[in-house]
């Protein structure tokens, strides 16, 4: 789970997120039944982001030996080449949290949240791309994000607000962030190949829909 919650009367409310004394963990859960045929390892099929883990073990007549749980870190291999250091310790802490938050939101796509939706929303993604530009010269995931959004084009000229996604969703204002992304990319790299080949036409269609083209 990502937080301890106050539960009762069918409601779940977040208070102090690490208050284990008064709260309860509410979140994703798995049920695993050992076969009893020797040492076994369990891993979920999709990555899980967490702050807290709770294990509940029920045994039968046979003994069960439980080894200490471990985790594997996964994500986009962002190599940070920028570093922020300050004599004020809180600045260093904020920098560490900010960089780890960015990395947790980078896998095959950018994600608005690594625990809940895990979806690539245009407005969130633009902010994450700008942060990526500041800490690394790697533009590959940014380029992929713009290719992804290009593939979400609908007949009326709008892009989906999040993509790839199983269910379509359109937030008209979010389309402008795609145009901002393209401008940011040009200012960062000076490259025009992807813009002219893949993204410029989408930008013109969006502007036309907004009555600006």
Which positions does each model-derived feature cover?
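Aromatic- and histidine-enriched alpha-helix N-cap/loop-to-helix transition segments
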Residues: 48, 116-126, 137, 169-177
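Extracellular/oxidizing-compartment recognition motifs
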Residues: 1-112, 124, 140-145, 158-164, ...
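Noncatalytic linker/hinge segments flanking ATPase motor cores
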Residues: 95-99, 111-114, 126, 172, ...
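Short, flexible active-site loop motifs that bind/organize anionic cofactors or intermediates
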Residues: 43, 118, 185
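Helix-boundary and N-terminal cytosolic regulatory elements
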Residues: 129-130
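Helix-terminus loop motifs that line ligand-binding clefts
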Residues: 3-25, 137-213
